[in-house]
Every structure is written in structure tokens, then in C-alpha cells.
Amino acid sequence: MSEMQQPWSLVGLTEAEYRRVVEILGREPNPTELHMFGVMWSEHCAYKHSKAALRRLPTRGEHVLQGPGENAGVVRIDDDLAVAFKLESHNHPSFVDPFNGAATGVGGILRDVFTMGARPVATLNSLRFGPLDEPKQRELLRGVVAGIGHYGNTVGVPCIGGEVYFDESYRGNCLVNAMCIGILRPDRIHRGIAAGPGNAIMVVGNPTGRDGIHAASLLASAEFSGSEAEAALPTVPVGDPFAEKMLMEACLELFETDAVVGIQDMGAAGLISSSSEMAARGGVGVELDVRKVPAREEGMEPWEFLLSESQERMLVCVKKGREAEVEAICRKWGVGCAVIGRVTDDGMVRVLDDGRVVAEVPARALAEAPVYHPAKAEPAYLAELRAFDWSRLPEPEDWNETLLRLLGSPNIGARAWIYEQFDHMVQAGTVLGPGGDAGVIRLGAAVAPGAHGLTRQPPGEGLPGRSGQAGPPKGIAASVDCNGRYVYLNPRRGTAIAVAEAARNCVVTGARPVAITNNCNFGNPEKPEIFWTFDEAITGMAEACEALGTPVTGGNVSFYNETSGEAIHPTPTIGMIAVHENLDRLTTPGFKQVGDVILLLGETRDELGGSEYARLIHGVLAGDAPALDLAFEKRLQDVVLRAIHEGLVTAAHDVAEGGLAVALAEMAIAAAEPSLGCQVSIFLGEGRVDGQLFGESQSRILVTATREQVGRLQALLMVEQIPFRVLGDVTADGRFRLAALAPGSGSAHVYRRQELIDLPVADLVRAHKEAIPRWMDA
């Protein structure tokens, strides 16, 4: 019998891991126990290849109430409010079944947040697909977007932002990362723990079926060979968002009692994962009878009950004698529930089948899988790509056409085709929705602290401050960011850039970054080059989080994003949370009024590595990721926040994909009036013109200021030693004009002016708007 036919390999274990199981138990595991170890020691559940590296991330900070290890991280906003948030992937299921994979990804991240005792108030998403000119990729995009919209809209949680990229590296593995934000009281955090021998273990939510069995161990913990997608269709669960809504309301009401000891979402690996993790955290055991689990299918085996990933289910540890209260609340909301077991004091997960013991395993053994330290090797491609000679690339003859092509790229253009399928105004708390630098919600618009938890509050009402009096309206800004091309070219720096840009996107709205969650999407960690990339990315993430003061509160690692041996670009997505102390100072990117002065903060270098311009116009992905000075990044962000809150800035926008010319165009596109345009000039040195226009140098922010305030702004920038240039003015003619100034012959103070771009803003709007619809609506 070959190893692939051995029982352990059929559940995803290696022979060495199987031998360790035998050593732990002191005997051969029976089939049910083997299934239990198979899922709990899978990469998806155990993080066995990533755990050692993740320990290097900074996880402590003045705002952090709950760091990694729980269903979601929690940060304090003030004495009355905290935010729970989490970012997680549903990549493999979404490639197999785009609609259901994406929908259940939203459902899972919502449960992760409301399990903590928080009411979900916003979601974001980070999506990756192959090129849109391929029918398969358009099919994936349609299915994923429809699934996200169906689930989120039905539950009634607004989608306030996100990002999407299209690149050849995601052709065989799309990425679907979902983020959720919830509001709770700082003293009302609920955790996934079982405690108190004799306390009841209850399952709350939908009945259990066979859907999703082994999805964690065999779908999300292995790479595709190209044929698995069709064969694995039955492993993707189907979600019910209305049931999720009822489950959420029931759980939030349960939290207003003191009957709940602990609660855990039954997500990946289902009942066995939630029960063993709760027991291990509490240092106790649990005894479960699978025949007491409400089932929707006949003849289910014990291991099927344990591994089912049927959606919309929770496992709850309830104080002994309080079961009837839980049942009454569940009945009120039309949610099923049943007592299926009890907490024990022996540290064992004991599984019964109608009273007969069918499995008995130490809870800690299931929860503490082997930790590996894979071999590392720097990829050979890096040296070749970094040696690329940029002088080989000709500069465009038509700068107007080049700008329009970039604005029409699906990686830069408007995402309205996507986010218009999502409800971003439900709950009446959205201040800035999708399409800007970051999403922003108003605290107090939908929920506020009550005597026992969270209660409804009319839109627009302020929240009490520390003094108990109404203060300035507060908000939460959030963004998700990662440029996989940067990480491909320089994993350490590219990941640091992802953290910096996620923070910068919040800062330009006026919000101060406080913490991150992450979703690390990589290929097969057993390949030394892939693991080297992952390890470098974690180093870059740690360095950036330390420099910017944004600790990591949790996240997710998704390995094995490969098909036929071809891995995705490494994509460590960052979800950033920032606090807006005064929404009256909220800043948006669009030009506001004629005569405002346009300034560029930060320095532009001759950098084209990883840029959208190089890839789209020249078909080149080469060079190095843009340079990043984290100390300067922190200073820049602090100064911009100060300028915004002192009322010195009328608009602010991060310079990112597409570079300076695209960022300026985006400010014109988002202008308060369609008649607004701009007249700007850039100074040329010895570098390339395209590098000045479309290079993606980091730590740059565009701002506008009134003529009355621009002097104060310039003085602040000079005192804080922030380099800046006055580029020009907002105009009233509805045109976008960009000229280059080059040193003339003779005097150093004489400049030769060359008009590079002169276009109606309406043309920019049209190109930007049609970037995705021209493919999807063709």
C-alpha cells in the first residue's frame, strides 16, 4: 500500500505526524480520532508552518484589549467603546464555487466578530483575479461579487471599502479576503473558552449536514493541480444570510445575560475545532454526544458531525442551570439550539454516539499541532529582475493617451461596478463609503453602549466622552491594502509598504491608525523559495508596525495558493483600523474650490519597479519595490493629521498606483463640482519623465489648501522638515493640465516649460468609470 493510500494520508496527515498521534494516544487512533487529528493538524487550522514566524509580530499596544489567539482582535477607542475586527480568507472555496465560497467567507468573518460580543457595523474586502480579458476570470469576479453582496446585504452590514487587483499570477487562484468591524463595550468582551466542570455545552444555530467536510484539511491546506476544482465542488458549504442575521441577534441578546461562559464560531473543522479549542483555552475537557446535535441529514457518522462545516452555527458554554434562558432567547429569534454535552475536568475531548464512546483525545493535543521550521532559500528570480535596465524602455510619445490608458486599467479605474452591488448605507453610519482612500463610519450612528451591551441610537447623535458630555463626532476609518507586485520584487519592503499605505489611506481622511489585522496569502510553504518570501514578509510587517505604532491583533495565513506548481504573487493583505477623533474635520480627496493651492508632500524618485505603468504600458514587471523610509513615513503621517485637524487642508489623497499624474487625476475626478480642474507643473531633473509622472514612490500625499491657509501649512511643513512642492492650483475650466519644467540653458533660474497633458476632466471621468464595465458589460 502506497503512502497516498494510507489512512493518515487520506485525512491530510504525514506519516511522521501519524506516528506522533500514536505516541500521544499510546495506541493506534480509531477512524473517528484520525479524522479529528487530520483537520486539527491541517495547515488551515494549526498554522504549523507559519506559527513560529508569526511570533515575531508586535502584538501589544496601549489600545489593544485582545490580541492574536481569539476569534477577532479588540482595540479600545475610549472608556465607552471598543472595536473588534478581523481579516480572513476564503480563497480556495471561492475558486471552486465563487458565489458560495465568497458568501460563506462573509458569513464566517461576521461570526468571528459578533462572537466577541460586538455588533458588526462594517465590512471590507480584498479581491484578486487573473486578467479580465479572460472569460473564466470574469465568471469568477461575477460570482464572488454576487456572493459577497447577497450575504452582506441580507444580514444588513454595510460594505464601506476594499480593493481589487487583476494579475496573471492570480489566474489559477483567486483571492477573497473579507474584513469585518464590530462595536462593543470594552468590559463586555466574550471569548472562545470552556470553563467550569458541569457547565453545559450547547450548539446554537442551523442544523448540521454533510457540507464542507474536510474543507479545511483537503481544500484549504493543499494546492490545486488543475482538476481538483471540479471534483471538490461538494465541499463548499452553502450559507443562509437570513439565518445568520437571526443568529447574530440571538447571540447579542445572550450576551446581555451572564449565562454565557464562552462562545466559539463553528467555522473551519466545525464542531471538533470549536470544542477542542475552547477546552484547551480553558484547561478543561468536554464530553459531547453527536446524536444530540440537530441534524438535517440521515445516517451521519460521528466523524461527519465533528467535521461538518455547515454554516451559521455557534458552540456555547453555558452556566449549569441557565440552559432554559438560552433556549428562550433562541426561540424568540427562531434559532435552533440543543444541549449536546458538558464541561469536564479531565482535559479530554470525549465524543459519544448515543452514549457510546467513539473517540477520546486530549484537548491540548488537538489544539497544539506540530510546529515546523521549513527550509528557506532566496528565489533566483530576484537578482535577475533587480538587474533590469530601465533605459531600454522608450518613453511614451503621447502622454494624454498614457494617462487615459492608466485610468482605464482595472487596477486603477473605478470599482463602482463592484461596490454598487453592495449596500454601503445600511445602518445609517457610513460617512465615507467605497471608492475613496478609506471607508469611514460614524460611531453612534447605528449602535452605542447601553446598560448591558449595545443598543440602537438615532443617526447623527454624538457619543458621550470621558466627561459624560457630548463631544465632537467620532468615527472609525478602515482600509485594506497590499500590492502583490511589490512583495514579489521585495517581500520585506513590499509588505512594509502595504502597512504604510494602509495607514496612509486612513490618515488622509483625518484618522489616526491604531492597529492592524492581516491576511497572508502565499504559495506552498514546503518550497524553500516560498517560505523565504513569507518569512521576509513577516519581518517587513513587524518593522512597519513597530515604526507606525500599529500592533497586530490577529489575522489569517492562507498557504498553498498554487495551481499546477504556479504560485500567486505573495499577497500579505493588511487591514488597518484608525480612530477619527472629530468627523467635523473629515477630509476627502476631491478638489473643493477654485483657487485652492495643490501641494505634493514627500519626494518623488526615479522609480518604476512594480508600477502599473511599467506593467500596462510596457509589459514589464522588474526592478525593485519603491524605497521606503519608515521613520519619515511616520513623521509625514503625523504632520498631515495635525494639518487636517488644524483646518489647514481642504483635500488630501495618497499617491499610490499610477503615481503622481494618476493621483492628481483622481482628485479631479472626485472634485466637488464637474467644472473644477487643475493647472499643475512638475520639475524635471535628470531622471525619466515617465518616472516623475507614473512612478510609485512611497510616502507621498497630495493636499490642497486655501490661499488664506497655505502659508500656515507651508510653515508647518518646514518646521517639521517635510519636503514639499507647490504644484499649482485648482481651476474653473474643467480641464486637467500638467506641464513639465526643465532647467533652461544658461541661468539656473530659467526653466523651459513643456505641456505634457491637457485633457477635459470629463475624459478622465469616462476612462476611469469604464475600466471594469467595459469588460464585464461587453
Curated annotation (Swiss-Prot):
Disordered as annotated region, ranges? 455-474
Q: Which UniProt keywords apply?
A: ATP-binding, Cytoplasm, Ligase, Magnesium, Metal-binding, Nucleotide-binding, Purine biosynthesis
Catalysed conversion reaction: N(2)-formyl-N(1)-(5-phospho-beta-D-ribosyl)glycinamide + L-glutamine + ATP + H2O = 2-formamido-N(1)-(5-O-phospho-beta-D-ribosyl)acetamidine + L-glutamate + ADP + phosphate + H(+)
Where's it found, cell-wise?
Answer: Cytoplasm
> Where is it chiefly localized?
cytoplasm
Does the keyword section mention RNA-binding?
no
The record's annotation in Gene3D superfamilies points to: PurM-like C-terminal domain, PurM-like, N-terminal domain
Swiss-Prot/TrEMBL GO biological process terms: 'de novo' IMP biosynthetic process
Entry GO CC: cytoplasm
One Pfam match:
AIRS_C
Q: Which PANTHER family does UniProt cross-reference here?
A: PHOSPHORIBOSYLFORMYLGLYCINAMIDINE SYNTHASE SUBUNIT PURL
Which family does the similarity line name? Belongs to the FGAMS family.
The protein's role, per its UniProt record: Part of the phosphoribosylformylglycinamidine synthase complex involved in the purines biosynthetic pathway. Catalyzes the ATP-dependent conversion of formylglycinamide ribonucleotide (FGAR) and glutamine to yield formylglycinamidine ribonucleotide (FGAM) and glutamate. The FGAM synthase complex is composed of three subunits. PurQ produces an ammonia molecule by converting glutamine to glutamate. PurL transfers the ammonia molecule to FGAR to form FGAM in an ATP-dependent manner.
UniProt protein name: Phosphoribosylformylglycinamidine synthase subunit PurL
Name the source organism: Symbiobacterium thermophilum (strain DSM 24528 / JCM 14929 / IAM 14863 / T)
